[in-house]
């Protein structure tokens, strides 16, 4: 939200100044898209002071703000939510690393992120574009549907072939052919999906 820089000369404190961090242009739109994709709640975890965090959160329509947090505090908040839900965490700093490791899914910024955050995250946004997360959510949903289709289809066909084989209605070579066929159907099903 902002960066504080302290100035000293010859071991004497001369003052400090703050540089405001601006949110990325796509952040508000990104948060709205997340809601459309089933993400229930967005929560800000920041080490910055509460007043500034609240202003920032209002601009972005963030549901909940937790400010003035140390890395261990961020981890505690994340673990509280993780008891009842899956959590996804997006961060860029070294202070975000503990939460990134603990989260069910985490993203770091590749260009602006610290090395520790990049190492701790599950995914790295190479160009720091948050819309990459939306694409990841879309791909993971398609993948989940595909996996379920393949599992259910494979089990169903194998059970049918097993029953037919048990009653002698299908020869051994037919069962082997059906088994290979199930594998081919699963592969073809996977190939039909365009990501």
Language-model segments: residues:
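Conserved ATP-binding TGD loop and adjacent catalytic N/P-domain core of P-type ATPases
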Residues: 2, 6-149
């Amino acid at each position: 939200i902002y960066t504080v820089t302290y100035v000293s000369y010859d071991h004497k404190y001369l003052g400090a100044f703050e540089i405001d961090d601006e949110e990325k242009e796509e952040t508000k739109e990104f948060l709205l898209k997340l809601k459309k994709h089933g993400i229930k709640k967005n929560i800000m975890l920041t080490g910055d002071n509460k007043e500034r965090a609240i202003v920032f959160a209002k601009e972005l329509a963030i549901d909940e703000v937790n400010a003035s947090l140390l890395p261990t505090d961020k981890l505690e908040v994340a673990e509280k939510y993780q008891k009842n839900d899956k959590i996804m965490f997006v961060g860029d700093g070294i202070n975000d690393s503990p939460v990134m490791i603990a989260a069910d899914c985490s993203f770091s910024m590749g260009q602006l992120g610290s090395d520790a955050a990049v190492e701790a995250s599950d995914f790295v946004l190479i160009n720091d574009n948050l819309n990459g997360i939306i694409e990841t959510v879309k791909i993971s949903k398609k993948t989940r549907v595909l996996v379920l289709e393949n599992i259910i289809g494979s089990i169903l066909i194998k059970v049918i072939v097993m029953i037919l084989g048990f009653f002698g209605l299908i020869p051994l070579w037919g069962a082997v052919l059906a088994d290979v066929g199930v594998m081919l159907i699963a592969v073809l099903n996977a190939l039909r999906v365009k990501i």
